[in-house]
């Protein structure tokens, strides 16, 4: 299997996000890397499902609550940016203050 650097990055995000999902399901709070990976993964999957950039930016503020992350994480995550593939091409999606 030959993967580009971008594909390797996305695979790493997916791996970390699956770990984050398991931890959330067990009632554990996410740390900074897990929270960012989880948010990025949901953007990638939303784009794959055909959602627009605007929809993802709006929904992205509802995916994680402060009580689902470790203390201090919301203050560290002011924005998450990820390039996602949409039906009309690759676009940058930015989530502003996504953990509320």
Curated annotation (Swiss-Prot):
Q: Does the keyword Transmembrane apply?
A: no
Where does it live in the cell?
A: Cytoplasm
This protein's source sits in the domain of life called Bacteria
| Entry keyword Cytoplasm | yes
What chemistry does it catalyse, as a reaction equation?
urea + 2 H2O + H(+) = hydrogencarbonate + 2 NH4(+)
Q: Could you say which EC number(s) this protein's record lists?
A: 3.5.1.5
What is its pathway?
Nitrogen metabolism; urea degradation; CO(2) and NH(3) from urea (urease route): step 1/1
Its Gene Ontology biological processes? urea catabolic process
Q: Name the Pfam families on file.
A: Urease_gamma
Q: Which cellular component, as a GO term, is one annotated location? A: cytoplasm
Enumerate the UniProt keywords alphabetically: Cytoplasm, Hydrolase
- Alphabetized GO MF terms: nickel cation binding; urease activity
Predominant localisation class = cytoplasm
The text of the family note is: Belongs to the urease gamma subunit family.
The subunit structure is:
Heterotrimer of UreA (gamma), UreB (beta) and UreC (alpha) subunits. Three heterotrimers associate to form the active enzyme.
The name this protein goes by in its record = Urease subunit gamma
């Amino acid at each position: 299997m030959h993967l580009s650097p971008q594909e390797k990055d996305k695979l790493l995000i997916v791996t970390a996000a699956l770990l984050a999902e398991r931890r959330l399901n067990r009632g554990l709070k996410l740390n900074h890397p897990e929270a960012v990976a989880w948010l990025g993964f949901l953007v990638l999957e939303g784009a794959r499902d055909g959602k627009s950039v605007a929809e993802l930016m709006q929904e992205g503020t509802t995916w994680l609550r402060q009580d689902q992350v470790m203390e201090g994480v919301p203050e560290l995550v002011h924005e998450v940016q990820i390039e996602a593939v949409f039906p009309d091409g690759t676009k940058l999606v930015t989530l502003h203050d996504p953990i509320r």
